[in-house]
Amino acid sequence: MASLIRKIRNRFQPVAPLPAGMHHYQSPPDAPAPYRLHLRLEPDGTGILILNASTVLHLNPTAAECAYLWVKDSTPDQAAKTIASRYRVDRKQALRDYTDFIQRVETLLRTTDLDPVTFLDFDRHDPYSKEISAPYRLDCALTYRLPEGENVHYAPTERVKNELTADDWEKILDKAWAAGIPHVVFTGGEPVLRDDLPALIAHAEKNGQVCGVLSGSPRLGSADYLKTLLDSGLDHLMVLLNPDREESWAAVKTAMQADLATTVHLTLNADLAARGESILDRLRQAEVKWLSLSASDADGAKCLVTLRDRAADRGLSLQWDLPVPYSSANPVSQEIGAPSSGAGKAWLYVEPDGDVLPEQGVNRVLGNFLSDPWETIREKARTK
């Protein structure tokens, strides 16, 4: 009788999640299209799967289990047997589900210009509402310097006077990777002013990290310079658009001609809000797919919702959560002080001197990423 009760109890007990941790897979050298996978399993059974160091997939527990079996090189039959046993489902159904997952991910592996962050069978807000082992993204402000001719007061140069060296930033990238942070973004100021930007991108690529750059530099209009960044391993780009400068539009055009996931950011003020629809039309003509919006004054803020709707009408997808580089188009005085839901949890922001903030504009120092233990920084972020 006791044995029967145990069997009944076991049948209805929830499936225990797989052990949390990092797992890696490299396809065989003779594979038709070589690829590499990095899987981070969370304590609650969810996970993130990094495809070719270029796309982060957020996975629910079932998808995370399929990914785990895949990176462990299980055959479909072995995977189906394991899933059927753990979830008490028919083995044929388990095989169909596993095969479907693999096919969907393989399709993503073959897709160009893919959104760098994708939520597979996951509501986009779910990952930001739970406890996770490490942030999903590290925003690295390489410098608060601005291009010649821009007012330095648009960036917090008085508060942060020092810049880390390339060696220091490489140590930070390594430390972030060891902590399980899969995605890094280089921002500023103007990150393109750092001559070592291509080398830092290459270092992140070597680690396996997804890497993006946020910039408003006219240098992005140079196909040769953009190719240098791409060849270094750049995965996605956000162009900070100044609609009144043709060199800014040239940067958008060059980025759209490259094999690169590109978002265009527009910071609204009263003047730009009045011209918002014509700007959206020009972006659509340039075949821009992704748009980021913010406001620098009250009039711009009033028009945000309307312009979001107009953007959606034109088929533009809205991107959220990325920091916008300090510049004349995004003045520091307009930064909000209240942290967003993902601040300190889903992402962290590193200033040019290595100090860590919950996010851009929230000036509460959690420690220094270069000199302080990661565990200390993470604990302070959790107790915000």
PLM feature spans:
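Acidic, low-complexity/disordered tracts enriched in E/D and polar residues
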Residues: 1-68, 129-132
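Long, charge-rich, low-complexity alpha-helical segments
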Residues: 3-9, 55-140, 166
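Basic phosphate/pyrophosphate-binding loop/patch that engages nucleotide-derived ligands
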Residues: 10-19, 257, 284-285, 308-314
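Canonical Radical SAM [4Fe-4S] cluster-binding loop centered on the CxxxCxxC motif
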Residues: 130-168, 179, 360
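Radical SAM/AdoMet-radical enzyme domain recognition
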Residues: 155, 166-187, 194-300
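C-terminal accessory region of radical SAM enzymes
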Residues: 304-332, 355-384
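Short, small/polar residue-rich loop motifs at catalytic or cofactor-binding pockets
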Residues: 341-345
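Short, acidic, Ser/Thr-enriched surface-loop or helix-capping motifs
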Residues: 350-351
